């Protein structure tokens, strides 16, 4: 009996009707190779289950009891595309290689269900704009806990737990960047904390808007399982006329938060034990200098922020 299937890959649909129930999963993959150029060993077919597990290559399609025109999502990259992605452009040692960050990033970043979740956030999440985006400015997205202040230590006031040089850092950044606060907590908590730290009332800079945990999405990764992330695509989808991957940088002390946008994320050292480290922490001073250096660039997505200190030392040594 002939099977009719629809394979979804790369934003396209590929109808298949030349396979029979006696053909195997591997036969299906070889048919897809001729259509897409993706090698069978590079493919993942989502939704093909046998006895509760992903169907192995030798499983016959007939035992999977596929309904006519069943839609199957395929993941995989053409060999030439992989070579292109993995080969760093010449004469630029600051260009990021996604595979250095994490091999699963490529899969997570482009997975269709994750992009669909972002689209829903773009459509449904309500942003309260505190100050309108400014033409020609880049975008700086900042985490709160352990990035701007130590939220675990005890103190009489929030000022005691504030990261050193916070207001100087934000004042300097505001010259070149619109500033967005994004915390994995509730908006009520974010507003209270920003007010307590004097961030939303400072005359030297303005916050464009703030995002809470409701703007985040959950993604599945092979290595980490389910994780919550902060997809910058939510901001780009809502304010695409101002912000994109080319002019956005995000600071967070948790690297997985920018799993969907690794090329835009900078993992900041966490600020903890404020009473012990208040006089020693100079992270925001150095990062202020880094932001000033890269503000001159047309495309921030080509930088590897993992090596920001090396980049800064190199620039300052010139």
Swiss-Prot record:
It is found in: Nucleus. Keywords: Hydrolase, Magnesium, Metal-binding, Nucleus, Protein phosphatase. GO terms for molecular function: metal ion binding; protein serine/threonine phosphatase activity. Residues 3-81 form the Ubiquitin-like domain. GO terms for cellular component: nucleus. Its EC number is 3.1.3.16. It catalyses: O-phospho-L-seryl-[protein] + H2O = L-seryl-[protein] + phosphate; O-phospho-L-threonyl-[protein] + H2O = L-threonyl-[protein] + phosphate. It comes from the Eukaryota. Its cofactor is Mg(2+). InterPro entries: FCP1_dom (IPR004274), HAD-like_sf (IPR036412), HAD-SF_hydro_IIID (IPR011943), HAD_sf (IPR023214), Ubiquitin-like_dom (IPR000626), Ubiquitin-like_domsf (IPR029071), UBLCP1 (IPR051658). GO terms for biological process: regulation of proteasome assembly. Pfam families: NIF, ubiquitin. Residues 133-294 form the FCP1 homology domain. Signal peptide: none annotated. SUPFAM superfamilies: HAD-like, Ubiquitin-like. The keyword Hydrolase applies. Mg(2+) binds at residues 143, 145, 253. CDD domains: Ubl_UBLCP1. NCBIfam families: HAD_IIID1. The Ubiquitin-like domain mediates interaction with proteasomes. Dephosphorylates 26S nuclear proteasomes, thereby decreasing their proteolytic activity. Recruited to the 19S regulatory particle of the 26S proteasome where it dephosphorylates 19S component psmc2 which impairs psmc2 ATPase activity and disrupts 26S proteasome assembly. Has also been reported to stimulate the proteolytic activity of the 26S proteasome. This is Ubiquitin-like domain-containing CTD phosphatase 1.
């Amino acid at each position: 009996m002939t099977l009719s299937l629809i394979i979804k890959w790369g934003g396209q649909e590929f109808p298949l009707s030349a396979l029979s129930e006696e053909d195997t999963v591997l036969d299906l993959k070889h048919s897809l190779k001729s259509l897409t150029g993706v090698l069978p060993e590079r493919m993942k077919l989502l939704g093909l289950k046998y006895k509760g597990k992903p169907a192995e290559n030798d499983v016959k399609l007939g035992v999977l009891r596929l309904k006519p025109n069943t839609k199957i999502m395929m993941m995989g990259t053409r060999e030439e595309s992989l070579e292109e992605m993995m080969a760093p452009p010449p004469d630029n040692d600051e260009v990021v290689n996604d595979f250095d960050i994490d091999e699963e990033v490529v899969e997570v970043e482009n997975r269709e269900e994750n992009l669909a979740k972002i689209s829903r956030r773009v459509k449904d999440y309500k942003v309260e704009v505190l100050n309108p985006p400014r033409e020609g400015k880049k975008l700086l997205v900042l985490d709160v806990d352990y990035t701007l202040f130590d939220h675990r230590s005890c103190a009489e006031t929030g000022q005691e737990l504030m990261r050193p040089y916070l207001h100087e850092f934000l004042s300097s950044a505001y010259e070149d960047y619109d500033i967005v606060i994004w915390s994995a907590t509730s908006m009520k908590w974010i507003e209270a904390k920003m007010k307590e730290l004097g961030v939303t009332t400072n005359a030297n800079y303005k916050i464009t808007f703030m995002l809470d945990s409701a703007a985040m999405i959950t993604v599945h990764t092979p290595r980490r399982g389910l994780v919550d992330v902060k997809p910058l695509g939510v901001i780009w989808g809502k304010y695409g006329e101002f912000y994109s991957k080319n002019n956005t940088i995000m600071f967070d002390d948790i690297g997985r938060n920018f799993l969907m946008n690794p090329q835009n994320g900078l993992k900041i050292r966490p600020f903890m034990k404020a009473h012990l480290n208040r006089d020693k922490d100079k992270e925001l001073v150095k990062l202020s200098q880094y932001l000033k250096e890269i503000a001159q660039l047309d495309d921030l997505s080509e930088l590897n922020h993992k090596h920001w200190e090396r980049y800064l030392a190199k620039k300052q040594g010139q």
